Amino acid sequence: MKRYGNLIHDIADPETIKLALHQAAIGKRHRKSVSRRLNHEEETIQQIQYLLLSGEFKPAKVKTWTAHEQDKDRQITTTPFFPDQIIHWSIMLVLQPIFLKSMYEYNLATVTGRGMAQGRKVIPKWLQNDPKRTKYCLKMDIHHFYASINTDILKLKLQHRFKDPQVLRLLGVIIDSYSPGLPLGLYTSQWLANFYLEDFDHQVKNDWRVPHYVRYMDDLVMLSGNKKKLHRARDQMDAYLKAEGLIIKSNWQLFRVGSRPIDFLGYRFYRDHVTLRRKLALRIRRKAAKVGRKDRLTYHDAASMISYWGWLKHTNSYGFYHKYVKPNCSIKKAKGIVKHENNLRNRTGW
């Protein structure tokens, strides 16, 4: 595997920092701490460049808050916009293309152009086009993935990929500033967590010969025509991940496709159709009813309904949409409201 060097000057390049500044500011321009930095762009770029090249950057203390997502409580970490978030973005703008070169094709999280949409396309494609090798499904996830990452192993993996001492020192300072593992919520954490399982992904496909495999961060789905081989692969995965400090949750499932759907990414995949996960369908139904009871459609409600429409249009939910959504909310009207508000924000810099 090629090792990459001479990267710190790319990370500290004024154009990289400028792009990082504006990327980190998306959705936050109304905050005083962010607008102040945008209004003094050149000064901000020079300060970030100095911190990167001098090696004087020290991560600030983080703040944590609890997010309730799909019946789970997650501890989300946030850092100051300046300098931390800008520096995280500067680093990843340069390292992303390197990570992508060796990233497994169906590792869906974090990467623009992949995500849930690609998972929605590829799983039905496998089920319909390769019925012999999709008879059985092994579904499992990793317990407390981010917090369980062994940072010593992570830094060793980074040393095998990069040889720029300043970049390795910078990454090490960021990684060592949080414990245990990697903090959920930081831009660097997403990419480093995916990188941590890169070797595992290729092991699943190339060494353990699982015909079809897809991963969305810590959620894994494998398909095969041989139940015994999936059981054997699961044992190999369990041993491999334990050596990396990771534990497969005890609620893993191995079942025959057709006896039940594959519940993954918010969808329920059958051989010949796709529906929404029941809890998600109920959430959409309740939101649509709530919107329908209001006198007017607000920006936030419109944005929510457009997001839900994105789920519905990729499933066989025609009847559900016409019964529960269409009578309460016009998607066309919602799109108009969001477009108008976004144009207004772009003009005002908000």
Where in this protein do the model-derived segments appear?
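Active-site-proximal segment of RNA-dependent polymerases
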Residues: 3-8, 92-150
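A common structural junction motif
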Residues: 238-246
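Short, conserved non-catalytic motifs in the polymerase core
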Residues: 27-35, 60-86, 102-114, 173-194
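Amphipathic alpha-helical blocks
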Residues: 37-61
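Conserved polymerase palm-domain catalytic core
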Residues: 51, 121-217, 221-236, 255-256, ...
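Non-catalytic, polymerase-adjacent accessory regions of viral genome-replication enzymes
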Residues: 1-46, 349-350
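Right-hand nucleic-acid polymerase module
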Residues: 80, 85, 89, 174-177, ...
